[in-house]
Amino acid sequence: MALFVFWREGAAAGRPAGQLHALLDGAAHIAPDRVTRGEAGGPAWRWHFVAYATRTHFYTPEAQVWQAPGQGACVIHGLIWRMRGTVPELLDAAAVAALLDRPGAMLPGDVMGEYAVVRLLPDGSLVAFSDRPGLHQLFHAADGAPVVANRASLAATVLDDAAPDPAGQRWLAAIGYRVGTATAYRAVRQLAQERVLRFAAEGMAIDAMADPIVRLDRPRGFHPALDPLLDEGIAQAQAAIRLGIPADGPVDLPITGGKDSRVVLALCLAAGLRDRLRLFTRGYAGHPDVVAGAGIAAALGLPHRREAPHGSDDAAVWSGRRFFDTVAAQAWQSDHMVGGWDLILGTRIAADTLISGHMGEVLKAYSKKPLPEGPLDPVAMVRLQAPFDPMGLLHPEARAAIEGELAVQMDEARAQGAREGDLPDLFYYRNRLPNWLGAIRAIKSFERQPVVPLGAPALLRLAFQLTPEERKHELLHWLIISRCAPVLLAQPFAFQSWDPALGPDAPYVAPVLPAAGAPPAFGNWQYSLNSNASIRAALAAEVAAHGDLALWRSINREALVDRLHHRRLDYFDGISMLGLMIAIVQERGLGRPVKIGAAESDGVPSVTLAPHDPPRLIGHLDGVEGAAKAVGFGGWAYAPDWPAAQVALEARVRGQSLGVGVAGNDRPDLVPHGVGDGRHGFSFAIPRSDLIDAARGAGEVEVVISPFDGAGELARVKVVP
């Protein structure tokens, strides 16, 4: 992986290259294995560049940067390869430079991967582009100044303009990620999908790539004439798998309860890898994905293990400091361009790789919900699967601007031949893919670089030759599994099954669903927004203290404070709130520069927010109930100034925490007494073994029930361990 930025003299606001290099080193979000600085010039031009490269599963740092006297330079980021028959051939920077050896040259059609490329030619012209879906993003100056980078803040640093762009910010609060090419910075734009950026003596040009993935002017629907394209896609996908695994030894493969990972498993089985596979699933014990994954492994006689996903096995309730520090670190690492819900945070530089089922969502429909009659409304389209301003925070003018951006995209797609049913899938491909998954790639690829067989160009082309209904029925998933590993067709999925519209051969298998009382299937630590009233109080104080943010031109500040007091956040609300927090962090300059792989990252100071009063808590311990292995505590707790919060409580002995419980049980008897909606009861247990250890031989021990992450106490009670 290699961060890079190229700029021509005159674009850097008069600052010399030496001064810029020091600033760029600080803006890079990684601790690189190798830094390469270079320049090239002619009588009328001079380019400068810097590349921050790390060792990957595929490349040494040196292999990702090429320069030669009189021949220019080339930097690659990601993974680039081409098909040689059925064998994948890796391309390094020198090989890519040789293919882009003259103005106007592009990579051959058999080149694949996930990558960003920049090539400086001997005549001073420059070309830059990324993979067709745009998963590895490129950025350029909004005014056409000769700057290109694969991290937006590097371009903003060269341009000496880090002012936020309200047009990009408001999307984070509306849906949790950006739409279109606006970035977090007003001076920087993202290169659109399937576009080529060129700089020559006459200035900047952005051209469309030839032979686009999405062609809507062809006959639609799967038929036997498309079998060769399907076979080509399967061959490309299996070549990608071979590229991403070692020559021998075990192969770790993720398996979930969904269809994407099952298609990848089918491809691996058909490629003869069965005896090398070691399946694993991320999730808490008993999560439907874990249950389904273990069942598939058992049916095939393959080993299976459970891994903790990001954040889900951590404490479900976070302290305010941990919450804000984590969000602020992600804001900085992600260039403030994606919401905080998915906890996209990198900690280490590593050369791991992973065969991923990502991109499979492009092969199927954005949503399985039926479309309304008539022309599709922009907001209704987004809401088929995702939030759109779920808390009603957008000012009318900002909402209208967002709807207008969506409407323009939709009308352009209709003009290209899109049906109404295509529009949600095109929205996903053209926006969520580069701007959400691309943001994940920009961080997590430095730890574990994914290989994505379902992103095979032939499969993507085939997906958009299907009808919208065929994608909704997940026809491609069915066809690939049927051809490669039909034994997998009848294994249960999590939350879903095969669509009966596939025909009588499609088995209906009851899906695996969450057990009663299971944790949320989507999200965990994020619900600290509901259970730690201190987080709400701190955020409300920060909003109240800074009324001059440009963000408030789009977001109703008073409505936001009201929601923090009175609205209990659900899944979509949380996505919106954590998107909004990223935008606030940017404007307030609160991003924590936690560099991926840097030894000093633990020493980065915590976020300093506006002062706030600790939330006032009332409540009562109604009773203590002893059982053979645990002692239970029950009662109610309520923060009157933050009635939507369902406060977390902590049981402590001599200051040591023995357990945390959330006052979220339904207690209708509390409502007549003014205790909110009554959903403020608590009941949690402490293992007797923990109480015995805490008692240190005493016959009884005093347990203090206190606010989690707060001062004071709710009750004290003596219990026998």
Region roles according to the model:
Residues M112-V117, A247-P250, A316-K368, E403-P450:
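Conserved adenosine/adenylate-binding substructure
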Residues L126-F129, L135-F139, T157, D313-A316, ...:
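Short catalytic/ligand-binding loop motif for oxyanion handling, primarily in non-cytosolic enzymes
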Residues M1-P254, K259-A308:
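Cysteine-centered catalytic environments shared across enzyme families
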Residues A192, P228, E232, Q236, ...:
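Generic recognition of stable, solvent-exposed alpha-helical segments in well-folded globular domains
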Residues E600-P721:
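Basic, ligand-binding patches in group-transfer machinery
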Residues A285-I344, H358-F388, Q465-P468:
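ATP-dependent adenylate-handling ligase core
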Residues E9-A11, G18, V35-A44, V188, ...:
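Adenosyl-5′-phosphate
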